[in-house]
Swiss-Prot record:
A Pfam family this chain is assigned to: IGPD
Keywords recorded for this protein, A-Z: Amino-acid biosynthesis, Cytoplasm, Histidine biosynthesis, Lyase
Gene3D superfamilies per the UniProt record, alphabetical: Imidazole glycerol phosphate dehydratase, domain 1 (3.30.230.40)
Organism encoding this protein: Methanobrevibacter smithii (strain ATCC 35061 / DSM 861 / OCM 144 / PS)
Class of this enzyme: lyase
InterPro entries assigned: IGPD_sf (IPR038494), ImidazoleglycerolP_deHydtase (IPR000807), ImidazoleglycerP_deHydtase_CS (IPR020565), Ribosomal_Su5_D2-typ_SF (IPR020568)
Signal sequence coordinates: none
Protein name: Imidazoleglycerol-phosphate dehydratase
Amino acid sequence: MDRKSNVSRTTSETDIQIEMNLDGKGKYNISTGVNFFNHMLEAFSKHSMIDLVVDAKGDIEIDDHHTIEDVGILLGEAFRQAIGDKRGIKRMADATVPMDESVAKVAIDISGRSYCNMEFDFTNEKIGDMTSEIVVHFFESFVSSAKLNIYGVSKGANDHHQAEAVFKAFAKSLKEAIKIEHDEIPSTKGVL
């Protein structure tokens, strides 16, 4: 089974191309114009073992919203295409990741339905060059396209550490949920 995708999206605000290999080695080439977001996507790729190429150009002279939102939408679409009919996947997984004084927990269900519940304890308006509030919106955008459920929570005193712990917990839970365990659709309905 070839679990790869190559997707693109062009709007008046952004121009994005994404390549994804779910059965990769955690190799990445990320360029979004938002340095802290690049760092988060690199951590996601490395810890999920998903090979990821993201080339995004957006209207970051306005702010980071359109670029990060559209990367989330397209990343979700790339995931949905790569995962296919979900035959044999573990489907549900969770991970807890500490980073210094911070800790994050993320649980995922690749259910075919979209739901996002993320609670972060950010105290600053920005984390590096990325607005703090866009972190939740990135996950909402990803989930709406990927068609999965995600619950995440973080606590800590350092926003950088919290965000990084969240992206790593997301990566580790997704890595586990996409593992092939058998040859069946993991649902009593027979479809996801």
